[in-house]
Regions:
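A short Gly-Trp-Pro
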Residues: 1-115
Length: 115
């Protein structure tokens, strides 16, 4: 299935393709503050619909994940990084996807504080 996602103001917009079997709630210092529910897909399954420079990038801790946010409204719709197997990966904040029933998606909790 193809989903459209964006920040609040629409200056960062993308499409993501795949099936959302579950989402991840992480308690690391960043995710806890953002309140994201993450869906991981290959980076090749995500396509930006707006210019890349509409989004800022924030890194912390080990500096291996590019947390992307809208420079206008500040919403964090996705992040980019590398999976343990070396594949380019996108972490989509499913709260930013259109037409999603969050109550229908199982949520797995990840102890990001411990890692």
């Amino acid at each position: 299935m193809k989903y459209i996602g964006s920040c609040h103001c629409g200056n960062v917009k993308f499409e993501a393709e795949g099936e959302i079997a579950s989402a991840m709630s992480c308690n690391c210092s960043m995710c806890q503050r953002k309140g994201s529910l993450l869906w991981f897909i290959p980076r090749s399954a995500m396509r930006l619909l707006t210019p890349d420079d509409n989004a800022g990038t924030y890194q912390f801790n080990k500096h291996v994940i590019n947390h992307r946010f809208c420079l206008t409204c500040g919403i964090h719709p996705y992040a980019e990084g590398t999976a343990p197997n070396g594949d380019a990966t996108a972490a989509i904040n499913i709260r930013c996807l259109e037409g999603i029933d969050l109550d229908a998606i199982p949520v797995q909790h990840y102890d990001g504080r411990a890692h």
